[in-house]
């Protein structure tokens, strides 16, 4: 993405900020969440909601695409069973948003929603989506925008917990290519990004071992991976809090 786009679209999505502009964005965000939550509480037919979200996810207007990503996040929280049932459609829309060619806000919202959705489905049945998500997330670890880097580290750490046997070889290669980024951002200029990086580094450390005698995977690391999975499924917001406060 060129510098002009980043100047226009990459202005602080920041991790927390108290600027007046953020308050206006938060207000719009609040009403958006309420709107989608009411739809699910009224039990509006899911196919209708998915149709609306699918249309908005591909709309030329970036604000509508952003709303679609947010709506999918609300769906994951309010109707996780439905998301599991229609996960291929949901994942397809989120990956589409993750690769948005213009809007950093759409990409950011997609990453946050993917963190919730992957937790609800416990990383099962991702198929080739695992590759798509991993490749794009890895490129965002070095993004100049603090919020994008933060969300990318959270999501990448989650992917480490869900790689499993099927994607172990692929993910090991991705982690090795990411090693420099992991080391650099341990000292990230943004303290919250640095904390998220440290937690993700621990989650990825088993994939960095070269020989058995240099294994990073202690008994504590194995317990942490199980804990990542449980929190990711039941309380993704707590998982993000732990990342932010270096509790794991």
Curated annotation (Swiss-Prot):
- Which protein are we looking at? Protein maestro
Give one Pfam family.
HEAT_MROH2B_C
Taxonomic source organism: Macaca fascicularis (Crab-eating macaque)
One Gene Ontology CC term in the entry: cytoplasm
Q: Which UniProt keywords apply?
A: Nucleus, Repeat
Q: Where are the HEAT repeats?
A: 44-79, 128-163
- Compartment list: Nucleus, Nucleolus
Where are the residues of the annotated region Disordered?
1-20
Q: Which domain of life is it from?
A: Eukaryota
């Amino acid at each position: 993405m060129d510098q002009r786009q980043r100047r226009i679209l990459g202005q602080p999505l920041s991790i927390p900020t108290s600027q007046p502009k953020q308050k206006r964005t938060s207000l719009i965000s609040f009403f958006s969440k309420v709107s989608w939550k009411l739809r699910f509480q009224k039990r509006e037919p899911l196919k209708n909601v998915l149709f609306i979200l699918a249309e908005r996810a591909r709309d030329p207007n970036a604000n509508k695409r952003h709303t679609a990503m947010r709506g999918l996040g609300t769906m994951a929280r309010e109707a996780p069973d439905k998301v599991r049932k229609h996960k291929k459609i949901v994942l397809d829309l989120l990956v589409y948003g993750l690769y948005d060619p213009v809007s950093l806000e759409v990409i950011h919202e997609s990453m946050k929603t993917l963190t919730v959705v992957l937790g609800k489905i416990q990383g099962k049945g991702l198929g080739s989506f695992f590759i798509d998500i991993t490749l794009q997330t890895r490129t965002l670890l070095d993004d100049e925008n603090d919020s994008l880097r933060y969300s990318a580290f959270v999501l990448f750490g989650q992917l480490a917990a869900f790689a499993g046997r099927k994607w172990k070889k692929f993910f090991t290669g991705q982690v090795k290519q990411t090693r420099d980024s992991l080391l650099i951002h341990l000292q990230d200029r943004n303290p919250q990004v640095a904390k998220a990086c440290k937690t993700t580094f621990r989650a990825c450390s088993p994939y960095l071992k070269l020989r058995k005698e240099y294994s990073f995977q202690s008994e504590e690391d194995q317990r942490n991976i199980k804990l990542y999975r449980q929190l990711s499924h039941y309380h993704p917001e707590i998982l993000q809090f732990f990342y932010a406060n270096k509790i794991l």
